[in-house]
């Protein structure tokens, strides 16, 4: 068995030299016990017994290649590396009938967006999507597959927003651009053929933060969203909860990433860590739209997102909370290489639509 696994390890290394995507898809086909053994051979020493075995293998490969964390001292280089990694795992995209890049002429400045429509001849609700990436990296291409899955399986239009990134812009500018994009959707609801003016916001990680901050700021405004989908959102820059210390090493999101994000998004712009502009858990939660909150069990952000969901419920907000215990931060971005991640993301898409329909 050891000889066989060593040979497979060498095969995986060869595939890695050619491209991360083929290697990852080969890993995903292995039985769980084989993945566990391979993770050990690759040197993954972190004790997370309940973590998905495929994720262990992928993290072992990342660490072996010296890629720990995704945000570093050079934001531009961090963006390049993140874009490269996401490009490396791409394969055939989920089919959506209409995908179009458009320009949004907003009061805060012109930005780009990508519009997905699974049935262009039908009126459908629209989901305004803000991508993750610590407010520093990411864009339309890095989250293209996620948006395609949301459009197809939630049966909604998706407008993915290419908002300006920190540290070049302040949180005030970034959030204003995202709120202006939501207002633009409402103002153009007839041209977009939005079913019964049904508009919601969604995002992963930093995008979840943006979604719920925008939702708070737009309460009682004409363009207030009807629902919010928050996928492992960051909502509290000030506090450090037990999950931060339990899962800050050997996983996708590290304590180093959190420190850099805090520096680029808060400290450099003199924003207090408990300002609701960046930490919505300290904001006014009254009259917030129904919230569908997703967490990953092995994630530094797990506890703050769970606490936020409790706060929403205590403030009378209709809320659904769902945890994926064996997953870590960023799992929805692994859909091109992980069947389980894709299954979970499809499940989230379908269940969110049911939740939205029930609470609209």
Regions from the language model: what does each represent?
Residues 9-26, 98-114, 118-360:
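Alpha/beta-hydrolase superfamily serine-hydrolase fold, recognizing
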Residues 1-115, 357-360:
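A glycine/proline-hinged amphipathic helix-loop "lid/cap" segment
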């Amino acid at each position: 068995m050891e000889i066989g696994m060593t040979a497979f390890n060498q095969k995986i290394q060869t595939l890695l030299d050619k491209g991360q995507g083929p290697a990852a898809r080969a890993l995903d086909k292995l039985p769980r016990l084989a993945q566990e053994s391979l993770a050990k051979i690759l040197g993954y020493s972190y004790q997370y017994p309940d973590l998905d075995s495929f994720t262990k293998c992928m993290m072992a490969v990342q660490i072996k290649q010296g890629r720990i964390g995704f945000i570093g001292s050079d934001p531009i280089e961090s963006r390049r590396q993140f874009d490269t990694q996401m490009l490396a795992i791409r394969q055939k995209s989920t089919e959506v009938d209409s995908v179009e890049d458009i320009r949004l002429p907003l009061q805060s400045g012109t930005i780009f967006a990508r519009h997905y429509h699974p049935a262009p001849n039908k009126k459908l609700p629209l989901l305004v999507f803000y991508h993750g990436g610590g407010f520093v990296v990411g864009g339309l291409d890095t989250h293209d597959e996620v948006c395609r899955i949301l459009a197809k399986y939630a049966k909604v239009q998706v407008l993915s927003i290419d908002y300006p990134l920190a540290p070049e812009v302040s949180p005030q500018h970034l959030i204003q651009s995202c709120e202006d994009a939501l207002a633009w959707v409402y103002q153009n609801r007839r041209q977009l053929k939005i079913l019964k003016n049904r508009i919601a916001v969604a995002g992963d990680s930093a995008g979840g933060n943006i979604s719920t901050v925008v939702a708070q700021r737009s309460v009682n405004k004409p363009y207030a969203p009807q629902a919010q989908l928050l996928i492992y959102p960051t909502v509290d820059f000030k506090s450090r909860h037990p999950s931060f210390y339990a899962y800050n090493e050997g996983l996708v999101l590290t304590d180093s990433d959190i420190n850099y994000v805090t520096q680029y998004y808060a400290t450099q712009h003199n924003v207090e860590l408990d300002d609701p502009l960046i930490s919505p858990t300290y904001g006014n939660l009254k009259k917030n739209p129904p919230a569908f909150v997703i967490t990953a069990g092995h994630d530094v952000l797990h506890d703050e997102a769970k606490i936020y969901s409790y706060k929403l419920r205590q403030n009378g907000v209709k809320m659904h909370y769902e945890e994926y215990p064996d997953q870590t931060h960023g799992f929805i971005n692994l859909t091109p290489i992980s069947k389980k991640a894709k299954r979970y993301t499809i499940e989230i898409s379908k269940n969110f639509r049911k939740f939205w329909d029930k609470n609209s």
